[in-house]
Amino acid sequence: MSKIFFDTETTGLKPSQIGQLAYIIQGDNNEIIGKNYYFEVEHVEDGAAAVTGMNTDFYKKASGGQRFADKANEIANDFNNKLAIAHNIEFDKNFMNIEMFRAGVPFGFDKTFDTMLFFKDICKIPGRGNYKFKNPKLIEVIQSLCIDTDKIEKYSEKIFNLHSGSFHNAMYDTASLLVLFNVYGEIYNGIYGYWRDTFVRKGAC
């Protein structure tokens, strides 16, 4: 089954609007296709702008006036019949579902995989209160596997033909998910292949 790694940058915490959607399709033959879209939005909460560095003016300029509905059919087709992979996927799913509903485009996730929940008991980062382990951040999972973040940066630039440069940019996070998933797959299967050889720091783990 083909996989689609994705991340969103949103206008707030509650399902309102998606300002950026980046995703990478990894086909059955390991072909890699990256897509990144910015969308014009009505409003960006101060908290969201502080985290991402992107406000309404940025989205208007970067999108060229394009809105989510303009690309909804293409996006829905790209997600169709694929394993969708994200970090804290329920958050992104809520935004995707509401944007597709607004656009009037039938949409659903066939199968999903949440890297945050999967790696929670692998990273074993102590939680607070009654929680044995905390939900790990994406960077914490990457660090636990000794993955080189500089190499992810360069890889994301190659895939999207752009400079991403931030953990709060959907392009970088999406490339991180792709690398993380494939590195762990090789580790789990006892394989030292392309992903471990390319992205894991030598002698670090």
Q: Residue spans of the language-model regions?
A:
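Conserved protein kinase catalytic core
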Residues: 13-15, 120, 179
